[in-house]
């Protein structure tokens, strides 16, 4: 029996290998990408735009990155105001409603979020504490599906219900995330289970920090930094994997809980939202192996080892550098680095931040030197986001879940747009590479 099992495992790679030549023959847009790396146009959206290059007579020309939500620049939306408390909520309103809120409209949204923050009776005990998960993303995904059972109108497709469901999940996911973290620590690491009640009137970022920290204390600067991070991650176009996943399921006319749970599953992937863990692990290795973080030659030497597949995970990739769209700059990384610089100045984190800036500056030079090719690459938001979260004492296993809590607003906006304007189920085609075969009875095989 064991030999039979092994033969099944051995055949998996062989049976599922598609001849690479077939991708060229048909031709296939692998990963829904064109040959120049740009995405295949699969739809039109009024929600956001991600700009990273220009096209000149068919050639990609690098350009400074731009990110707009409903036509507004992310630089203007986030701004430089260090005292702003509800930037994320303002962006949530903009994404869902299409316009920037007035003061009274923003207050109404905040009240709606507060009203939905509590979980259904018994949910925490039966759905979180009694069934903890080693991975918070899995528990988030499971919880979204379980909230379906507590919604008597779960299959209703009215706009009122869609908006109500979206606001409910935007409000509840942060609470589920923090509870899932403590349930995990209690179940698998024998730590105390901490459950703070939320404080009405707090912003989303304040609520997260207040529920996460045992003493509930945080500074206005920390709350503002988390607010900025959530704003930067709230939306990033319709073509990213999790948002497209949400649109695909929405085009099939499934319920909102199923669509959002699928998006969370996509975001968990190491090639999407989970990529930040690779960045943090690589940065940790560099910090441990480079003695003088200010020595450019020593830092460049270790980056060269990574590029030449002699260090870290031996893939030759410098995680945190490069992006599918952005070429000269990622506006999210620019903003993140700017606010991180302010927060780290004069603290024990300043030297580490300077090292990250050095990695960002040296990486293109090292690649050119080692590979002989000049790449238009910039730091992406993951280069600095993990560092920012570490400054705030946010555990690493909460980074991708925080991403999900932030992106929930973007997923909802795209689901709304798909329901109104999509009209057709998303159904691309697949060519077959298998020729017709003659069926033989089992005794003749």
State where each predicted segment sits:
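Non-transmembrane, aqueous-exposed alpha-helical and coiled segments at domain scale
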Residues: 1-445
């Amino acid at each position: 029996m064991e030999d039979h099992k092994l033969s099944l495992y051995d055949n998996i790679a062989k049976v599922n290998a598609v001849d690479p030549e077939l991708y060229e023959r048909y031709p296939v847009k692998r990963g829904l990408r064109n040959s120049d790396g740009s995405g295949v146009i699969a739809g039109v959206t009024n929600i956001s735009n991600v700009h990273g290059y220009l096209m000149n007579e068919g050639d990609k020309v690098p350009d400074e990155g731009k990110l707009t939500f409903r036509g507004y620049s992310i630089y203007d939306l986030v701004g430089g105001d260090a005292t702003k408390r509800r930037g994320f909520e303002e962006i949530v309103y903009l994404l869902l409603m299409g316009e920037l809120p007035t003061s009274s409209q923003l207050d109404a949204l905040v009240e709606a979020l507060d009203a939905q923050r509590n979980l259904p009776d018994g949910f925490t005990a039966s759905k979180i504490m009694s069934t903890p998960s080693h991975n918070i993303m899995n528990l988030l995904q499971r919880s979204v599906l379980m909230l379906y059972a507590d919604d008597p109108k779960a299959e209703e497709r009215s706009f009122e219900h869609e908006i109500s469901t979206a606001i409910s999940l935007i409000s509840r996911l942060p609470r589920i995330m923090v509870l899932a973290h403590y349930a995990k620590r209690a179940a698998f690491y024998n730590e105390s289970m901490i459950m703070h009640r939320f404080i009405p009137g707090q912003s989303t970022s304040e609520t997260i920090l207040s529920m996460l920290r045992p003493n509930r204390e945080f500074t206005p600067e920390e709350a503002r930094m988390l607010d900025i991070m959530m704003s930067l991650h709230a939306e990033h176009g319709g073509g990213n994997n999790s948002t497209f996943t949400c649109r695909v399921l929405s085009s099939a006319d499934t319920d909102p809980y199923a669509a959002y749970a699928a998006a969370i599953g996509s975001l968990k992937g190491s090639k999407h939202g989970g990529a930040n863990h690779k960045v943090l692990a690589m940065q940790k290795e560099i910090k441990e192996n480079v003695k003088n973080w200010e020595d450019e030659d020593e830092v460049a030497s270790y980056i060269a080892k990574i590029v030449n597949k002699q260090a870290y995970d031996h893939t030759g990739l410098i995680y945190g550098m490069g992006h599918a769209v952005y070429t000269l700059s990622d506006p999210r990384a620019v903003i993140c680095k700017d606010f991180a610089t302010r927060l780290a100045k004069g603290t024990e984190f300043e030297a580490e931040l300077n090292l990250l800036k050095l990695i960002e500056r040296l990486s293109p030079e090292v690649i050119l030197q080692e590979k002989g090719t000049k790449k238009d690459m910039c730091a992406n938001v993951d280069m600095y986001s993990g560092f920012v979260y570490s400054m705030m004492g946010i555990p690493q296993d909460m980074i991708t879940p925080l991403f999900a809590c932030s992106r929930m607003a973007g997923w909802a906006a795209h689901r709304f747009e798909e329901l109104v304007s999509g009209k057709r189920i998303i159904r691309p085609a697949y060519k077959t590479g298998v020729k017709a075969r003659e069926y033989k009875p089992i005794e003749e095989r």
